[in-house]
Amino acid sequence: MSTRRKFIKESAIVGTGISLAPSMVFPFNSRPAVDKLKIAFIGVGLRGTNHLNNAIHRKDTEITAICDIDQNRIDIALDLIKKDGRKKPLVFGKNEDDYLNLLESPEVDAVVIATPWLWHTKMTVAAMKAGVYAGVEVSASQTIEECWDLVNTHEATGTHMMFLENVNFRRDIMAVLNMVRQNVFGELLHFRCGYQHDLREVKFNDGKQPYG
């Protein structure tokens, strides 16, 4: 079990680009190499559809399943997939918990989670427990307890997960990662961070437009 001090140190590395050297922090369970990754999407709203478009443009992916409770968004996603000449994926959207059935499908290797924030930790934990690689939109958690849920579940399952935060790969952020790896800061006991982005229109939007 991680101590809080160990967690702080690991978080500095995780938050600044763990994907570049995963073996430095946690042992991972790996699947055999495949020519095409079977990928599913939970949440195909504005953000999820953007991720779907990116996956469609890759020839090393199979879009095997989508999940959303909004039929209109499902229809939009299916249309994009059809226009690319791909096979129709499995569709899950009977209720808010239908994503659990998606995660049980043998046709899913990895999942992109782009639902409302309050669902991120719950869905990511479920994916890791199902042995499904998870890419989760920010913010991945809302509380300290949820942060620990992600850490503990990863350590228990060894399943890959990644925060879909492109800022991690900015040059200044990568410079900090390099400093952590070279032990410039020594043992990290306390740090502060923040999100410099006005989110009032996102958190209190009208439900129709993505930014109010």
Spans of features found by a protein language model:
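Predominantly a Rossmann-like dinucleotide-binding segment in NAD(P)-dependent oxidoreductases
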Residues: G43, R47, T157-M162, V167-G212
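Short glycine-enriched loops at secondary-structure junctions
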Residues: W117, A140-S141, H197
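N-terminal glycine-/serine-/threonine-rich beta1-alpha1-beta2 phosphate-ribose binding loop
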Residues: M1-V136, W148-H160
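Conserved PLP phosphate-binding loop immediately N-terminal to the Schiff-base lysine helix
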Residues: S141-E145, R171
